[in-house]
Each structure stands twice: as structure tokens, then as C-alpha cells.
Amino acid sequence: AGDLSGDAENRIEDVMILVLEQENGKYVYRYMTEGERLESTGNSAQFQAKLLSTTKPVKLMLAGNYGDAFAAYAPSPGRSEAEVKAGIGCSFTGAARSLPMYGEIAVPSGLEADRENRFSVKMLRAVARIDVEKDLTADSRSLRIESVRLYRPNDKIQLAPDESFAP
């Protein structure tokens, strides 16, 4: 364990964009591309990405600080949104430096080729943080934590949440 500064908790060092297109009322995976020219300052980051134009509604899934998540996993075009989300996971290696993050945005109008498409996406950390504070005085009782329980069925960090995402 260790302490992360506020900057380290919010820093985004790399981002992968997974593009899903609506087909028969459901989103299906099409392709992914890496964010370029990433600039991270304070609580925000800006980047550029080359995306294919489409008039169909799209959903952009963003994986920030994704580590080795795509080293052995590349979703196949046509996969469902749930399958893609379930497959995105990374090891704990490097997680103490920059926390893995996830965000998504639906773009009902699709992506236009003749103009710059700009979006603001809130990112959710894949790792929870709990701060415990106790004010101490001369007659304070000591703080004792009986137990801390964390559950993870494997050795991977799950980037995308299971339930609907609403930061």
C-alpha cells in the first residue's frame, strides 16, 4: 500500500477509446483506438483520437491508465457491450502510480466527418479510496478497526462497472 497524491489519483497517462455502434437497438463493438496528444492538468485531461464517421448512434467507452488490459484482450467486432465490458481488466501492476479509470458517453447523432467532435466525459476510478480520520485529544480513545474486507474473485482490476454507469 501507499499514499497517492491528489494529482496521482486523478492523473490520466493514457487512454483507449472503444467505439460501439447501435445495431437493432443495442450497442455492439466496432473498433478501438488510442488517444493521442494527451494533456493532463489537475482534474482534467484532453486528447485527440481518430474515429470513423457514422450516422448511427455510437457509444464511446474510455479506459484510462489501462495498463495491460489490452495486451491479451482485443474484443472482436460485433461483440455485445456487456461482453466487452466484462473483458476489460488489468493487473495491479502500476496501479499505485496512476489509477485505472473508466468513462463512457452515448452520442445519439453519430460521429461527423466534416467537423471536430468534442465531448466531455467524467471518468470513474476503478479503485475505491476510503479515508479514516479521528481527531485526537489528550483523553481520546484509540481508534481500532476490527476488520477490512475486500472481495475480488480474481487478480484483475475490473475497469468497467457491471451496473449502469452514471458518474
Give the ranges of each region predicted by the language model:
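Sec-type signal peptide cleavage vicinity
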Residues: 1-167
